[in-house]
């Protein structure tokens, strides 16, 4: 059974069998494949705790996912900080509260291990995602994204720096 008695999708730990469906949802949402990204993500998911990757399932089908976890002192961020790396919901199931259900389940699990702050990165020109995270109480933080587009190569660097304001 993949829905509870109220018809709400079941949230569970992501399993290796979910990978193809997660990638399919990501392609539907973004409009392009990201094989290198997902290869790296699934390698990390396998090494992290079970709270770091969840899926929402309805009628035996994965309809959404969230990947995140607890800081391991990346960028000097302490362990009481949680991250949302990636969240996606099949377009056919969007605007039905699935992403909020996934987010709530993950944050409840993160709180149990001492996380009291969640961080994510969003493109400033993505109003839908910004509105979603704003509706969950997110606001601008102290981290900034620095980007360098080198004219001599195709390498793009993203550097994150903590501002001491």
Positions of predicted regions on the chain:
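Residue-level recognition of the GNAT/N-acetyltransferase active site
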Residues: 15, 90, 94, 123
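Acetyl-CoA-dependent GNAT
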Residues: 13-17, 24, 28-79, 85
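Conserved N-terminal entry element of GNAT/NAT acetyltransferase domains
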Residues: 1-17, 153-165
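Active-site/acyl-donor-binding loops of N-acyltransferases
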Residues: 135-155
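Conserved active-site alpha-helix within GNAT-family acetyltransferase domains
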Residues: 100, 112, 124-142
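Conserved GNAT acetyl-CoA-binding A-motif
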Residues: 110-122
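Conserved acetyl-CoA-binding loop-helix of GNAT-fold acetyltransferases
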Residues: 89, 95-108, 135
């Amino acid at each position: 059974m993949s829905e509870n008695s109220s018809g709400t999708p079941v949230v569970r730990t992501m399993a290796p069998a979910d990978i193809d469906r997660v990638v399919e949802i990501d392609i539907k949402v973004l409009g392009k494949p990201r094989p290198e990204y997902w290869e790296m993500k699934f390698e990390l998911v396998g090494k992290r705790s079970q709270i770091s990757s969840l899926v929402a399932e309805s009628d035996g089908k994965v309809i959404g996912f969230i990947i995140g976890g607890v800081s391991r002192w990346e960028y000097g961020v302490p362990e009481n900080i949680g991250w949302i790396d990636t969240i996606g919901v099949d377009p056919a199931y969007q605007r039905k509260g699935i992403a909020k259900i996934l987010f709530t389940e993950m944050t409840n699990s993160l709180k149990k291990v001492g996380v009291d702050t969640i961080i994510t990165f969003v493109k400033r020109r993505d109003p839908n995602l910004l509105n979603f995270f704003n509706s969950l109480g997110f606001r601008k933080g102290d981290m900034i994204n620095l980007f360098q587009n080198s004219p001599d190569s195709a390498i793009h660097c993203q550097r994150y720096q903590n501002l001491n304001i």
